[in-house]
Amino acid sequence: MILKSFILGNLVSLCMKIINSVVVVGLYYGFLTTFSMGPSYLFLLRARVIEEGEEGTEKKVSATTGFITGQLMMFISIYYAPLHLALGRPHTITVLALPYLLFHFFWNNHKHFFDYGSTTRNSMRNLSIQCVFLNNLIFQLFNHFILPSSMLVRLVNIYMFRCNNKMLFVTSSFVGWLIGHILFMKWVGLILVWIQQNNSLRSNKYIRSNKYLVSELRNSMARIFSILLFITCVYSLGRIPSPIFTKKLKETSETEEREEETDVEIETTPETKGTKQEQEGSTEEDPSSSLFSEEKENPDKIDETEEIRVNGKEKTKDEFHFHFKETCYKNRPVYETFYLDGNQENSKLEIFLDKKDKDLVWFEKPRVTILFDYKRWNRPFRYIKNDQFKNAVRKEMSQYFFSTCRSDGKERISFTYPPSLSTFLEMIQRKMSLFTTEKLSSDELYNHWNYNNEQKKKNLSNEFINRVEVLDKGFRVLNILEKKTRLCNDETKKEYLPKIYDPFLSGLYRGKVNFFFSPSIINEISIKNYIEMLWINKIYLILLISNYQEFEPKMEDRIRILKFLFDAIIVDSKNKKIVKKSTEIKKEISKQIPRWSYKLIDDLEQQEGENEENAAEDHEIRSRKAKRVVIFTDNQENPDSNTYNNSKTKDTTNFDQTGEVALIRYSQQSDFRRDIIKGSMRTQRRKIAILKLFQANLHSPLFLDRIDKFLFFAFDTSELMKIMFINWMCKNAEFTISDSTSTYTEEKTKESDKKEKEEIKNRREEDKREEKVRIEIAETWDSIIFAQAIRGCVLVIQSILRKYILLPSLIIAKNIIRMLLFQIPEWSEDLKDWNREMHVKCTYNGVQLSETEFPKNWLTDGIQIKILFPFRLQPWHRSKFKFLSKDPIKKKRQKNDFCFLTVWGMEAELPFGSPRKELSLFEPIFKKLKKKIRKLKKNGFLTLTILKEKRKLFLHLPKETKNWFIKGILFLKEIINKFSKSKRNPILLFGFREVYELNETKNEKNSPINNRTIHKFSTSIRSMDWINYSLTEKKMKDLNARTKTIRNQIEKITKEKKKRFLISERNISPNKLSYNAKRLKLKSSKNILQILKRNNAQLVRKSYFFIKILIEKIYIDILLAIINIPRINVQFFLESPRKMINKYIYMYNKKENHKRIEKTNQNTLIHFISIIKKALNYSNFNKNSKIFYNITSLSQAYVFYKLSQVQVINLYKLRSVFQYHGASLFLKNEIKDYFGVQGRFQFKLKDTNFRNSVMNEWKNWVRSTYQYKYDLSQIRWSSLISQKWRNRMNQQHMIQNKDLNKWNLYDKDQLIHYEKQNNFEVDSLSNQKDNFKKYYRYNILLYKSINYEDKKDSSIYELPFQLNNKQELFYNYKIDKRKLFDMSGGIPVNKHLTEDDIIDTEKSSHRKYLDWRILHFGLRKKVDIESWIDTGTKQKKNLFDWMGMNEEILDRPTSNLEFWFFPKFVILCNAYKIKSWVIPIKLLFLNFNGTKNVSENKKINKKKNNDPFISISSNETKSIQLKNQNHEEKESEDQVDLESVLVNQEKDVEEDYVRSDRKERRKKKQYKSNTEAELDFLLKRYLCFQLRWDDSLNQKIINNIKIYCLLLRLTNPREIIISSIQRGELSLDILMIQKDLTLTELMKKGILIIESTRLSVKNDGKFIMYQTINILLVHKRKQQINQRYRKKNYIDKKNFNESIVINQSLTRNKDKNNYDLPVPENLLSSKHRRELRILISFNSKNGNDINTEIINNNNIKNHAHIIDKRKHFDRDKNKLIKLKLFLWPNYRLEDLACINRYWFDTNNASRFSMIRIHICPRLKSR
C-alpha cells in the first residue's frame, strides 16, 4: 500500500510539474493565440479559395509562408526589444499601414474599376506571388484582431513577466500557434471539399441556371476581399480615437486681472513687535470672498500665467502683475496679489526673453504629438465628482504602470509606477548629456542602501536614548520634547515667517507659493540666471540646456534670497497687514502648462452659469442630450425666484437673470454619452446592448436576467402561473352554501373589490402601453432630421385650416340644411362656440404658452397645438337648464374639455396619443330616431297582444257569457260617458304594469337566493275594460307552481335563520336583549307569512283581479323584509363583538403605555420579567385561547420569574452552578448574575482572584443595570455619563476592590462565545461588539496583532466604558456590522449600547451637539423612549421622545406631515451625535425659521474654522465655541456676533463649501430671499438629507405651472381660470403658497418634506484605508482640544505625572486604569518617530529582531514599579504592556498608510496584512 501510494504521489507530482512547465504553458498559450482572427486571415483564405492551377499552388504556399513568417516576427518581437520598438510604436506601424493600404486598394482596382474581371492575372503577373507573400506578412504585423478580441494574443506578453526561461517560452508558444494554425487550415480545407462534393448545392436549380452569376462571382472575388479588408480596417480604426480630432487639453491662456489687493496676514509670537510702515495703494477686500478660490495650485485655472504690473498706473495688453497661489489657512485668505517695485534692468530682461521664446517654439509643439499623444491626455473616460474631495480628472486612470525602480536597495519591476515620472525620465535621458549611463550592480546598491539605513538608525536611536535618559533624571517633559524647526528672521525679535510660507513645516501649514525676487536685491550679472531658474519651468531648462551647472545660484545669492523673504514681508503689529514692495517689468514671462481641469462641467451647469461673470467657455462632459425650452419671459423685475422640479417628466426649471423661465427637456432615447469626457475613448467603456427601439437606460448584456421581461420570452410567466392556479382552484372548489349571510356578503364584496382592482390594474397597464407607444412616436419624431420642422409647419397649417376654413364651412352647411328643413337656424350659438375654441401653442412637452406666441426654437425643438374648448357641430342646441350627468364616465369626458391637434388634423387626448373618436353630426339624429322607433314598437306589440287575447276570448266563450259580458261592458260605457260628461278625469281601474325583475332591486347583492330562485315575475296586464279568462287560467297555473317554490324557499330560509341564531346565542353576551326581541319579531312575521301563503291559492282562484295584485305586493314586501332582517342582524352581531374587543385592546394598550411612561427612568426594571407579566395578563383575557411559548427562549425566564417572587431561597442544589465562574452551558449568564447581585440565594461570596477581576464599580453598575434589559437610547445613555462621578468611583475602587466579586462572565474566548451564541447564551457586549467592530474596521490580522493575548484589557483600544450585551427574549437580535461613514443607513439606532456610539459630553465640550430646539417640529403628545428605538422589528412608530422632549415640548401648531419622516430624521440626528465631527459646527448656528434674533449673551469665537474633512488631521484647535464655555480663555479680536455670521451666510456657503472653481464665477452670486439662501444652505452642506415634495403635489404643481404660463399671456384670463378650476387643473390650495415663506413654514404646510438620502458607499480599498486612519486622527484632534479638561491620574504622582506627555493620544481607556501608560516615542517628532520605526523594521540581517537597547533601557522604569504595587496584577500583563507600548504607538496606523505604497507598490488597503511582516515581529518572553 505504501509503495502504491508512493508511486501514485510521484505520478501526481510528475504530472503537476509537466503541466506547470514552461513548454506546456507556452504551447497552451500559443494554441489560444490561434483563435484570435484578423484581416490577415482574409488573404490566406482568398489564396485557398480562388487560386487554382500551378500558379494557384504557388500562391497558396507563398501566402502560408508569409503568414507564418509574420507571426514568427511578432513572437520574436516579444523577446527582442528593437523589433518590439519598431512594431509596437504607433508612429512606425502607421507609416507602414496607411501607404500600404492605399497601394493595395489601387492595386486591385487601378485598371478595371468598373469592369467585372480578374485584375491580378493581367497586370504585373510576375510580382503577384511576391505580393501575396507581402500581404500576408505585413497584415500579420499590423496586429488587427477582430474576433473575438485581441486579449488572446496578449496572453503571451502577460505571461512573459512570470516566466524565467523566456526564450523557451516564446519558442513553445510559437509552436503551439503553429499547431493551431495547421489544424485551422485543415478544417477550412475539409469544409471546401465538402462544399464541392455536396450534391444538394450542386443540384440547386438557381445556381445551375445562373452560371453567368457564378462565374461573375469568381471573377470579382478579389474586389470582394478588398472590400471586406477595408471594412475590417475601418472597424479597427473605429475602436481608437482619431489623434487629430480628439478633444485636447486647453492651451489657451486666459489672464485674469484684478484691481484689488488683499492684505496678507502674518502670524507672530506674543513677543513680536513689528515696525510700522505705510501701505501704498492697497484696498481691503472681504476675506470670505476669496476663500478656496485657487486652492491646490489653483486647480481650475488651466494655464499658470504669471503677471507683472507696470508702474502701478496703467494696464495694457503687455503689462501683467504677479500673484501668489492662494491656499486655505484657517479659513482666511493668506495672500492675494503681490506687486514688485523697481525700474531696473528692464531692457536686458526683454532681450533675453525674446531670445528664449524663439528657442522654445520647436520643443513645445513637436511634430509627433500632432498625430500621436503618447502621454495620453485624452485617456480618462469617467469623471466622479465629489464635493468633499475634488481630484483631477487625470486621477481616474489605471494605477497599473510597469517600470523599473529601486525598492529596498534593489532594482525591481513596479506595477504602480507613475507614468508621468517614467516619461519625464525618458526625456531627461534623451536630452541630458551629463546623465550617468553607468549602472551600479545590485549588490553594490543594496550594500550602500543598508549602510545608509544603519547610519540613520544609529543616529535616531542615540537621540532617542539620550532624550529618555534626560527625562529619567527628572527634567520637565516640555524641555525634552523634540521641537519643530521654524524659519526665523532674528533670534532676539523672534519674528517668524508665516506657517503657510515656512519651508520647514509640513502638513496643512505648507502652502505652495511662487516667490519672485526683485531685481533690486540681485546684481546685474545674475539676473538672467535667476529668471532662468525661477520663472521658466525647470523641466524645460534641463531638457534644453545641457550645461546647467553654471546657472546654479551661489552661496551669496542664497543668502540674499533668504534675506528677501523677510524684507519683502514687513509686519504692522496693530493691523496685521503685510506691506508689499513692487518693481516693474515690462514684458510678460509666462509658460502655458497644459493641465487637466479639476472641475468639469456638463451642459446643464454651463447653461446655469451663462449669465454669470467669468462663466466657463464650454462644457467638458457629454451628458444626456437635453433641450432648453423657454416657457415664460418676465419683463418685470423678479424679486424672488423659485425652482421647480419634475422628476416624472424629467423637466427642471431654470431662472436666469433675464427673467426667463425654462424647462430642460430630456429625450427618452438611450444615453450613449453616459457622462463621457470629451476626447476620451468610447470603446473602453463597458459594452452595451440595445434591445428595444427606444430604451431609456442602457445597460450591459450581463444584466439581461434582471430585466422584467427576458428578450426571448415576451410574456410574463409569473402572471400566467397565477391565472392557471386560480383556474385550477376554481375547478376543484366545491360549491357550498355559506352558514352565515355576512360571510356570503363579505365574499361577494371581496369578489367585487377584486374585480374592481383587476379592472384598475388592466386600465393602468393599458395606460402604460399607450404611454409607451406615445413616447416612442415622440422620440421617432425627435430622432429624424428635419422632422420637427416639417411637423411644426404641418400642425400650424392644420390649425389654420381647422379654425378658419373647415369649421366655418361646416357651420354654414348645417344652418342652410336647417333652413331647408324649415328649422330655425342657429347662427349665434354656433358662432359663439366657434369663438370659444382656442388654439394654444405649447412646447414639445405640452406646456401652454399663448395663442399667438410660438415657443423659442420651435422649428428645431418641436411644437404642440392644444385646442381648448374644441368646437362640436350639433344638429340642434339644447336648453341650458339640464340636469348634471351622474355617470362618472360622462363626467370625466366633460372634464377633459381640451385636446391636442395631430398632424392629420384629428384630436388626441395627449400629445402623440391615439386620435379619439369624434362625434358625428348625424349621431344625435340617429339616436333620437332609434328612441322613437323603439317606443312605437313597444306600444304596437302591446296592442297586438291585447287584440289577440280578446279574439281568443270571444271565440271560446259560450253565447250566454258573451251576452252577459257585453251587457256589463255597455253598462261600464254608460258610467264612463257620465263621468266624461261631468268633465272629470276617468278613473283608471286597470292599467299596464311594467315588466320588472328581482335582480334590478337595490338588494340584489345582499339577497342569498339571488340567481337561484325567482328570476322573473310574470307580466300582468291591467286592462281598462276587460281581461281574457283563458289568460288568467294560464297565469293561475304558473302562480301555483311558483307558490310552491316560494314556500319551500321560505322554509329553507327559516331553518337557516334558526341555525344561525342558535350559533349566535353562544357568543353574544346575555345582556344584549335586543337580539331576543328581534328574534321574536322575526318568528311572528314568519307565522303571518305562512298563514298568508296557505290561503294564497284559494284567494287567487276566487278573485282573479284585485287579490292577485294584492298578494303580489304583499309577497314582494314580506320576502324582501325576511331577506334583509337576518342580514342586518347578523352583520350587527358580527360587528359589535369586534368593536368591543378592539375597544378592550385599545384600553389595555393605553393603560400599558401609561405605565411604561411612568416607569421610564426606573433603572431597576427587569425587562424580560416585565414582558412575561404582560404575556400572563394577556393570557387571562380569554381563557379558551391557548398560548404557545418558545421553549428555547422563555423556559428559563419563566422559571426564574417564579423563583424571583420568593424572598430568600436556599438553593443548595444550585450552589455549584452559581458558584461556577466559567461559561455555563445551560444557565444564562444574565440570570445567574441577576440572582447573584440581588442576593436571592444564601451562600457565602467567595473572594477569588481571577485574571480579569480588576473592575471598577462603574462597570459593575452598568452591567447590572443593562443586563436587566432596560433599554435606553444611546443619547440617553450619553446623558447618564458623568466623568467626575466615574473618576470618584475609580478612586474608591482602589480601596474596595478586594472584596468585590465581579461574577467573571466577561473574559471569554471567541470560539466558545460563538458556540454560546448559537445556544442562545450570549456573551458580554464588551467582547462581542468589540470583536465584530474591530474585525471589520482594522482587519482581522491587525486586531490579532494588537490584542492577540487579551481581547478584553487592551491598554490602547479600550474606549470610555464597556457594557454587557444580553440576548433579548422577545426581540430580534442583530449584530451590528455597520459601515463607518454610511450616515443614513450604517449608524444603528437599535437597542444596543455600543462603545463607540457614546460621546462624553463633558470631555468633548468643543463639539456642538445638534440641539432639537433648532429644528422645530410639531409633536402631538409625549411618548416613551422605547416607542422610537429600533428593536429590529418592522413596527411603525409614529412618535418619539428625543433628548428630553417629554419634559419640554414646543408650543407650536401640529404639522400635517406624515410621521414616517421622524424615524429617518432620528437616524440622522443620532448619526450626528455619534459622529459630529463630520458636520461643521457653523451649520448649527444657522437659524432655520428665517428669523435672525439671537440672544446677545451668546457670541461665537470664530477661530480657525476650517473644512471639516481637512481639519480631521489638523494639529490645532479648529472649532467655534460659545463664549460662556470659554471663561478661562481671553477674548480675542476675532469674536463676532452670531448675527454677523448669519448676514455673511451666503458668502460662507459659497466660498467655504462650493470652492468656486471656474475663476470665482459663483463667488458674486447674491441671494434674493431667505428661502433661496436656506435651500442653498441645506442642499449644499454636508447634511445627509434632501428636500422633496409629495408625488401628488409634484404633478399638481407642474400642471399649475402650465396653466400659469398661459394665464400670464392672456389679456382676459377670467374664463380660462374658471374652466380650469372646474376641470381641476388649477388648484387653489397651491395658489395660496406665499412666496416669502421660510423653509420651516413650507415644511409645516406639508409642501416640502425632509427625507434622508440613500447614500451608496463603495467601500473600496482606499476608502477603508482612509476610514481606518481617520479613527486615530479624530482622537488626535480630541486630545489637542481636551487638554485643559484632562483629569489627574491617581497613581504615583511624583514620578509619573512629570512624564505625562502633552501629545498623548486619547485612544486608550478614559477610566485611567493603572496600566494606561504614556508612549516614550512621543518624545520625538512625528517625522523622526516614523523614520525610526521604519529603519528598525529594515533590519537586514535578522528580520525578526528589534533594537533591544531601546526596550531594555531605563525608559520603562517608571512604569514597572508602578505596576508592581498592584497585588493581584497578572505577571504576563506586565510583559504584554511593554510589548504593546513599544510596538504600537499611537501613530501606527498612520504609518501603515505611508509605508503601504512604497514598500508593496500598492495603495489598496486590502494588502494591509502584508505590512505586519516588517512592522510587528513577535517578541519572545524571557
UniProtKB/Swiss-Prot annotation:
Entry keyword annotation includes Transmembrane: yes
GO CC annotations on file: chloroplast inner membrane
A Pfam entry, by short name: Ycf1
Membrane topology: Multi-pass membrane protein
Coiled coil, from the record: 1031-1102
Record function comment: Involved in protein precursor import into chloroplasts. May be part of an intermediate translocation complex acting as a protein-conducting channel at the inner envelope.
Protein's recorded name: Protein TIC 214
